Structure formats: structure tokens, C-alpha cells
Regions:
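Loop-to-helix entry region of an early transmembrane alpha helix in multi-pass inner-membrane enzymes
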Residues: 69-73, 81-102
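Membrane-interface alpha helices of multi-pass inner-membrane proteins
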Residues: 149-154, 162-178, 184-191, 209, ...
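Extracytoplasmic
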Residues: 67, 339-472
Length: 475
């Protein structure tokens, strides 16, 4: 029976990996799952290639964003190596996805999972829609999550935290994404509950040293002003609106929307209730990861990419308990039914997305390339793909920074009022007041845009606006 059980798990893992590879290959030359947030990463990478960063703007007039330097710099290196922006972003995502899978396998083994349990961990992660979408998105979430999972794996191997490995990986995750604080908070929580606080103190000191060293290594790339911008925006000018109930509500919504995520959640909770894991770093890390994710998801602009670390650690928990679970037969049946079905669903869905007429954005890119005058785009990727530089990084933080009095963000509003832009590319109609009031650009940009520009057409689902021939008199 064991051979049959292990063989079935291996088969499901193969199906999950093949489905993921098929999705990546099908989407490789399209812009599927990339949006304005990916564009923010690309503009930061482009700025770095031109010696610019937040506080050191040049052709890019506004470089404020929530994203820290390491991942954009990785994308910049891939671009400098000769890849297009599309393929640099795709490659960065795939490499980060492979790192996360390797980290999850390593952490599962460190937690005591059997070889079959490790395969279950990988199958649960690879089959999940959240992982597949993130692996196409061109953003830092997978890289940061991979570092955090590696940190948890190191902690499982060094419970007293006498070495530097856990702190180094945890600091790397935090340097990649300022909200990636799973391991530091988990260590501090366990330290507060333990009689001996020395492991937590050792970790905190080493974490600080590695983090400072990481910032120092990036000083030639304006890392101080870059991190200062990311922190100040996160803490004092967060984009969009927030609601405390949104975090847990979003988690429940995703669990209700994706059967494979519900399966991971049930298996992880079952595993964490077992006595063997009650004092494990894996338990505190998973709980903290979920808590952090819900806190971030309270912001209405946050999406399921913030659940990647939680997904990976939950998958590790499920793999650890695979051989000892009292409901292992039920778990096997659920894995055999749910994961292949999820793979089938996502393969066909992404095949449709990739075949859609606007998936390659050829029309909107051509329009941006052909315009001789200055262009402003809600999704900066449109401009980079057209061989241009974008004046902004992020329309969401542009709104919040302008409201906070940032002169760089306010300058974009002034230029819009002066009808400086020969072409403005929006993701939806400018009349969508709720979207542009609460999420992107804000009234400071959109009111003069509506007054001084008119819709001149559509391209690949984007709305094109050009200056009005005659501006109507103010009322």
C-alpha cells in the first residue's frame, strides 16, 4: 500500500509541475498576469540602470513606491544581460518560484517530513493558483517568501539560533519586501513566551547586522533614499483605503474561491494541532505569516500575493504530518482529486488568457511608441515595452504621496493641468470616479485630466486620452 500511496503522490506532483510549466510556457511571450504593480518594479529597475532612485529622480519624475531594491535590481541585471523587459520580469518570477519550491522542500525535511511528505508539500504549493499567478507576475513576493521559508528551515535546524543562517535569510527576505517580517516576529514571539530569551536576542542582533550590511552593499544604488521612500510610504502614506475586517474576509474569500487553497488550509491546521508541532518554530512562523498577511490585506489595494509565505509554510506543515495524520487516507483522496482538477482549471484558463487579442498589448505599445510627445501611462510597462521611459513608477502611491504633500507627486498633477502630456494611457475610463479617487492618481491628477483631455480611442483594453482642442471654461 505504501508503494501505491507514494506513487500516487509522485504522480500528482508531476502533474502539478507539468501544469505549471505549461502555463509559464504559454504565457511567456504575453503580458498575462502583469499589471501596473509589475510596471512599478520595471520602472524601478529602469531607473537603477540610469543611476536614479527615489530622491534622485531624472527622466523619471516620480520614483516613489513600496518596493525595496533587491528584486528590481535583479530584474535590472537580467535586462542588462540582454533580455526584454517582458522576459526579464518573467525570468525573475520563474527563478524566484524555483527558489520558493526548493526552500519549501528544504524546510519540510528540516521539520522531519518523509520524502513522500516533501513531495506533498511541493505538490500543494505548485498546484495552487496563487503560486502560479505569482510565478507570472514579475514581482518580489516569491523571492521574499523563499527567503523567509529558508529562514524557517534554518531555524528548525538550529533551535537555539546559535548560527547566522536563520538571521541572514530572514534579513534577506525583509530587504526584498518591507512587509516580509514573518521570521523576526515569530522568533520574538517564541522568545517572549520562553524562559530563555537569549536565542531571540542573538537573532535580533544578527538580523540587524545583516540588514545593515545589505543596505550598505547597495549604497551606490541610492539604497538609503530608496528604503526611506518605501518605509515612509508604507507607514505614513499608504496607498488606497483600508478596512480592518478586509484582511480576514479576503483570506476566507480566497479559501472559498480555490479548492486547493482550502485543502492546504485544512491539512495545515490539522498538522499544527498535533502535539509534535505545538512547540515547533513552524507553528509560530505559520501563525505569524497568516497574521501579517491579514494585516496587509486590510488595505484595499493588497492582493493574494501577500499570502505566498503563508501558503508555503502551510504546505510544509501538511507535508510534515503526511505520514502521521489520522486522516491520511482522506487526505490522499483529497489530494488526488483536488490538485489535478486545480491544474486542469488553471491550464485552460491561462491558455484562454494568453490567446486573448490584447494579451500581447501590441496596439497600445504601438500607440505609445508612435507618439512623439511626452506620454503618461497608468501601467508603466506600456511605456517601457515601447522603448520609452516612464515619468512615474506607481499611480497608487502617486495618489497617496500627493495627498501627503510630496512635491514630486504633485508635479505630475501640475503637468497634467498644464496639458503637458501628448498622450495619457489609462486602464479604464477616466469617468470611473471611485477607482481614480480611492486607488490610482487621485483627484489632483484626474480632475485636470477630465477637464483638459478627451478620450481618443482604445487599444488592447486601455483607454487613450489626448489634450482637448479647446479647454472648456472653468465654471
Amino acid at each position: 500500500m505504501r508503494v501505491t500511496r507514494d506513487g500516487a503522490v509522485t504522480a500528482v506532483l508531476v502533474v502539478a509541475l507539468v501544469a505549471w510549466v505549461a502555463i509559464v510556457v504559454r504565457a511567456w511571450d504575453t503580458w498575462v498576469e502583469m499589471n501596473h504593480a509589475t510596471g512599478t518594479v520595471a520602472v524601478l529597475a529602469d531607473a537603477a540602470l540610469h543611476g536614479e532612485a527615489a530622491g534622485h529622480e531624472g527622466a523619471s519624475e516620480y520614483l516613489g513606491a513600496l518596493y525595496a531594491p533587491p528584486y528590481p535590481l535583479f530584474v535590472a541585471a537580467l535586462k542588462r544581460a540582454g533580455l526584454s523587459w517582458l522576459h526579464a520580469l518573467r525570468s525573475g518570477s520563474v527563478v524566484s518560484a524555483l527558489l520558493l519550491l526548493a526552500a519549501a522542500a528544504w524546510a519540510a525535511r528540516a521539520a522531519g517530513a518523509s520524502p513522500a511528505g516533501v513531495r506533498v508539500t511541493l505538490a500543494l504549493i505548485a498546484a495552487c493558483n496563487l503560486f502560479k499567478v505569482a510565478s507570472l507576475g514579475g514581482r518580489a513576493d516569491l523571492l521574499a517568501a523563499g527567503c523567509s521559508v529558508l529562514a524557517v528551515g534554518a531555524w528548525l535546524r538550529d533551535r537555539e539560533l546559535k548560527g547566522w543562517t536563520c538571521a541572514a535569510f530572514a534579513a534577506a527576505g525583509w530587504l526584498c519586501k518591507v512587509s516580509e517580517v514573518t521570521t523576526p516576529l515569530a522568533v520574538l514571539c517564541m522568545g517572549a513566551l520562553a524562559r530563555d530569551a537569549r536565542p531571540a536576542v542573538r537573532f535580533a542582533l544578527r538580523f540587524a547586522v545583516v540588514a545593515l550590511a545589505g543596505v550598505a552593499l547597495m549604497l551606490p544604488l541610492h539604497s538609503l533614499s530608496w528604503y526611506a521612500s518605501a518605509f515612509s510610504t508604507t507607514l505614513f502614506a499608504p496607498p488606497n483605503l483600508s478596512n480592518k475586517l478586509r484582511g480576514p474576509a479576503e483570506v476566507l474569500r480566497y479559501i472559498g474561491s480555490f479548492a486547493e487553497l482550502a485543502l492546504v488550509a485544512v491539512m495545515a491546521v490539522s498538522a499544527l494541532l498535533e502535539p509534535a508541532l505545538r512547540r515547533s518554530p513552524l507553528r509560530s512562523s505559520t501563525a505569524v505569516a497568516l497574521t501579517v498577511a491579514m494585516a496587509v490585506l486590510a488595505n484595499r489595494g493588497a492582493d493574494h500575493n501577500h499570502l505566498i509565505t503563508t501558503l508555503a509554510l502551510a504546505g510544509v506543515c501538511a507535508g510534515v504530518a503526511w505520514e502521521t495524520s489520522a486522516a491520511r487516507t482522506f487526505a490522499l483522496v483529497a489530494v488526488l482529486i483536488v490538485l489535478p482538477a486545480a491544474c486542469w482549471r488553471d491550464v485552460w484558463a491561462h491558455a484562454r488568457y494568453a490567446a486573448a487579442p490584447g494579451a500581447r498589448r501590441e496596439q497600445v505599445i504601438a500607440a505609445a511608441r508612435a507618439e512623439p510627445g511626452p506620454v503618461l501611462a497608468e501601467d508603466p510597462l506600456v511605456l517601457l515595452a515601447a522603448g520609452r521611459r516612464s515619468p512615474i513608477t506607481d499611480p497608487a502611491t502617486l495618489r497617496s504621496r500627493a495627498l501627503a504633500g510630496d512635491p514630486r507627486a504633485q508635479r505630475i498633477a501640475v503637468e497634467t493641468a498644464e496639458r503637458h502630456w501628448a498622450l495619457i494611457v489609462l486602464e479604464t475610463d477616466a469617468a470611473n470616479e471611485a477607482w481614480y479617487r480611492d486607488f490610482h492618481f487621485g483627484d489632483a491628477v484626474m480632475q485636470p485630466l477630465r477637464a483638459g483631455y478627451e478620450r481618443a480611442g482604445d487599444a488592447d483594453g486601455f483607454a487613450l486620452y489626448r489634450p482637448r482642442a479647446a479647454v472648456p471654461p472653468a465654471r
